[in-house]
Amino acid sequence: LSTSNNHALVIGASIAGLCAARVLSDFFHRVTLIERDELPSVPHGRATVPQDRHLHMLMARGANEFENLFPGLLTDMVAAGVPMLENRPDCIYFAAAGHALGTGHTLRKEFTAYVPSRPHLEWQLRRRVLELDNIEIVRGLVIEPRFEPTTQTVSGVLVAPPDDDDGAEPQFLAADLVVDAAGRGTRLPVWLSKWGYQRPAEQSMDIGINYASQQLRIPDGLIQEKVVVAGVAHDRSLGLGMLCYEDGTWVMTTFGVAGAKPPPTFGEMRALAERLLPARFNAALAQSEPIGAPMFHAFPASKWRRYDKLDRFPAGIVPFGDAVASFNPTFGQGMTMTSLQAGHLRRALQSPHGDLATQLNRATAKTTYPVWTMNAIGDISFHHGLTQSPPAWWRPAGALFDQFLGAAETDPVLAEWFLRRFSLLDSLYIVPPPRLIGRTIAHNVGLWLRERRQSASSRGRTLTAPRSP
């Protein structure tokens, strides 16, 4: 990190960039976000962020982290109509890998989550960032950072004017630190190669996700749950999710994995819902009213750029958010992982020892690894995911977890444990402790014995039934 903390610059003003800017504002005199889009003054989607029209989950852990970063955020979201999920049995219907979790009981531990639309959450964060005197958002397109070979340092970025200002010349903005929060389209690996550094190795998981989403109105009172999820399974490549948003509308997102195409019309989406959801949801959908046309999006692969493995890294620049790791969006963990990385950035900036990039990249890897690994096991086991040389233990682990989820259908203790771990609340590792593994085995053995007794009883009744004369 430069000895001068005069100016920090962030590439991208989406959720990751806003989180980074909020942290940087406590350490730098000025923070500038460079954003190519003209940002809306109200909650509204952007053409360059096509994923914001589809279902987004803000996990309970992410809500806590965002509140720490932006105090008062959760209260303001609820005041704006954002649904809040508490530990009541009627808040969520969650079917994971073909197993409908037994969440029909009040959770024993506190569990509070929030369901903002992606545009609303981004608007809330942007509003708070712009209230800080030392942060500004500048519209423009980053051409490339300026690299100083003599000091092996990035000293700023060259910024092109927005598309509607063709006559203006590119401008150089000097900075003591550049944060690349450009998302999945990051060009940092290319820049590193150009500057004489090694590109980071990439771990990828080909999942071939295709989305189709429909906004709709459902009359009040027909659905008690605010979150409805029926994920894909090893024998079914289609799934769906429904969320109730802050304006009272719902979004219904259908998705396919391994290249499977989701239904393209609302009528066909409803037909899929009839196959995947209990009858009460379909009765409500029968009275729903679609708003606008369906919207589509594709997510071919999850990627993790292993900056933590590099021996050399230039000073004055760090990667952040999806520029480091982009997760399978059907797990809904991306925004929460970004909020965790904001904490890593703060601690790295506070540390008097070591270089910033090394500390941030290593801390990010420590929280990315368990979530990436658990997601990869799920992708291999249930989503027909493809990756290079997967560890031999992944598929057996997926099969064991399938047994756990099967038991969690009727055991609320197991269901609550999974829901909290899936929300990244208690730990980033989804590894059941021995007592829960024992509970799972006992539960499944009990089910097997009951089925055996019922089968034997049925055969006995058949053998002793009187013959017809």
Language model features with spans:
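N-terminal Rossmann-like FAD-binding beta1-loop-alpha1 element of flavoenzymes
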Residues: 3-34
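N-terminal FAD cofactor-binding segment of flavoenzymes
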Residues: 23, 27, 43-94
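Helix N-cap at the beta1-alpha1 junction of Rossmann-like dinucleotide-binding domains, i.e.
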Residues: 38-40
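Short beta-strand to alpha-helix junction loop
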Residues: 57-58, 108-127, 181, 187, ...
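Helix-loop-beta segment of a Rossmann-like dinucleotide-binding subdomain
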Residues: 97-118, 156, 254-257
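Predominantly flavin-linked oxidoreductase catalytic cores and closely associated redox partners
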Residues: 131-272
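FAD/FMN-dependent oxidoreductases across multiple families
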Residues: 260-374
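C-terminal helical "tail/cap" subdomain of flavin- and related membrane-associated enzymes
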Residues: 346-469
